[in-house]
Amino acid sequence: MANSLLTISMITREAIELFVNSNAFIKNLDRQYDDDFGKKGAKIGSQLRIRLPNDYTVRTGPAVSIQDTAEQQTVLTLATQDGVDVSFSTADLLLSLDDFSERVMLPMMNNLAGGVAGTIMANSANTICNMAQNADAAGNILTPTSGTYLDAAATLAINSTPISAQKIINDPRTEARVVTSLSGLLNPTTAISDQYYEGMMYKALGATWFSDQTVLKFTTGTFTTGTLNGVPTVTGSTALTVSAITGTLAVGDIVTIAGVNAVNRVTKLSTGEPRQFVVTVAMVANATVLNVYPSLVPSSTGVAGGPAVQYQTVDASPASNATVTLYTNNGAAQTYRKSFRYAPQAITMATGDLPLPANKVVARHKYDNVSMRAITDYMIGTDQEITRLDVLFGSLVIRPEWMCVVPDKV
């Protein structure tokens, strides 16, 4: 009995499952799929509107204190179309699906998933506005300890991050260092065995651990000194006027402002700890505008202990000459591996159905909220039959405060 050829539908179905399962970062994101795109096909630039969680304040006493529901939303754009294009021989298509998957599809999907994950990481890592670091007295970043990861967990808790299903993504080199130092730390015997045999942490310190090659190596700015020049006059300010700074700040740097402490996002009470902000626009030496996230939303009176407000982020407005400090400041630029602890809901990856051209050999499948399209066609110019597999996707950090950088020295 003659072998049957693998069909494009079989190839696509196998490819999408391999794609989702071959990259740890993609597996541990919030993945969304909008079937509205399936009616006419999605294209680069298609958008999804995402509502953010509402926030309210609590009254004390029987008197009603009505507050508006001030809904916030953001837009996720399907901005990137990635794919892999190959020529299959008839001999390839006569293989069993298992053989074809191992020899051809697995390396294709591993690289495609890695490329997509790299794009998402590049768009996400430098939006994180929290950091828990292990540093020496001079401010030099060291390899994180168990206390560093637990400090990150505490920071996430203060920001009302969901406790269940938290993840820790490490650079592979960081993972190796951490497994060595934490391998015997109050773990069940089976977990210690897994660490010994596999060289991975798996589950520890309230999170599921994994390593991924997409983790960024980040270089800080050379910032040494800077002060605010006036008090922000608008609640929710993200652009702060400063005196000409000494040194530089990079997008993704973490800074604090003297006298501006974080608040618990549920109780709105001050934590007594400096609120960390992420720099969103790079600053050169002598620049005078500091752009940050989150926005500065103090109490209604602008002073610590004042009446709470919706979406409050800090306990008080800064003084007009408050000092700005680079959190990783040791007097020079530092390069570190930007591992982080996070809730999967912090980052959303969305995909849409690409259109299916008429009169072509095509297939499209969805698996675990990821859509992939395949097209096979004959190229008359090169006398080849080629197949292309495409994913149209976009990503957005919905809640940067639900992530916390755990840096490791390079």
Please tell me what each predicted stretch does:
Residues 1-74, 403:
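N-terminal "assembly arms/tails" that initiate or stabilize quaternary assembly
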Residues 33-42, 146-181:
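Short, low-complexity, charged/polar segments at coil/turn and helix-coil boundaries
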Residues 50, 76-134, 140, 157-174, ...:
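Long, contiguous amphipathic alpha-helices that act as assembly "spine/axial" helices in icosahedral shell
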Residues 95-103, 107-161, 174, 214-244, ...:
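Alpha-helical scaffold segments that mediate packing/assembly in large oligomeric complexes
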Residues 400-410:
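Structural signal for terminal/edge beta-strands and the immediately following C-terminal loop/tail
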